[in-house]
Amino acid sequence: MFNLFLTDTVWYVGQIIFIVAVCLMVTITVVAFLASIKLCIQLCGLCNTLVLSPSIYLYDRSKQLYKYYNEEVRPPPLEVDDIIIQTL
């Protein structure tokens, strides 16, 4: 009779350990999945910060510089004599 109760106790303890182990595995899997989703979101934000934002900034800045140098600052036209002197 004593052996039967000890076997039942070990069986219950084994089930408790199994349930705790399964819960830990599920928790670790869910946390890893959520961390990978968070990492993907961070990488997309990093891609936006490092690739798209500088390219948009450079496009806008170069457009401003192009307008500035082509519309506002125009060098005086060279005379024919000045062109000949510069080429010599």
UniProtKB/Swiss-Prot annotation:
Topology term for the membrane: Single-pass type III membrane protein
Transmembrane residue ranges: 17-37
GO cellular component terms listed in the entry, alphabetical order: host cell Golgi membrane; membrane
Topological region Intravirion: 38-79
InterPro entries, sorted: E_protein_bCoV, E_protein_CoV
Virion surface side: 1-16
Signal peptide (UniProt feature, chain positions): none
Subcellular location: Host Golgi apparatus membrane
Coiled coil location: none
Taxonomic superkingdom: Viruses
Disulfide topology: none
Broad class of where this protein is predominantly found: host cell
Keyword annotations from UniProtKB, A to Z: Apoptosis, Host Golgi apparatus, Host membrane, Membrane, Transmembrane, Transmembrane helix
GO biological process assignments: disruption of cellular anatomical structure in another organism; viral budding from Golgi membrane
Family: Belongs to the betacoronaviruses E protein family.
Assembly with partners or alone: Homopentamer. Interacts with membrane protein M in the budding compartment of the host cell, which is located between endoplasmic reticulum and the Golgi complex. Interacts with Nucleoprotein.
Described purpose of this protein according to its UniProt entry: Plays a central role in virus morphogenesis and assembly. Acts as a viroporin and self-assembles in host membranes forming pentameric protein-lipid pores that allow ion transport. Also plays a role in the induction of apoptosis.
Protein name per its UniProtKB record: Envelope small membrane protein
Species in which this protein is naturally found: Murine coronavirus (strain S)
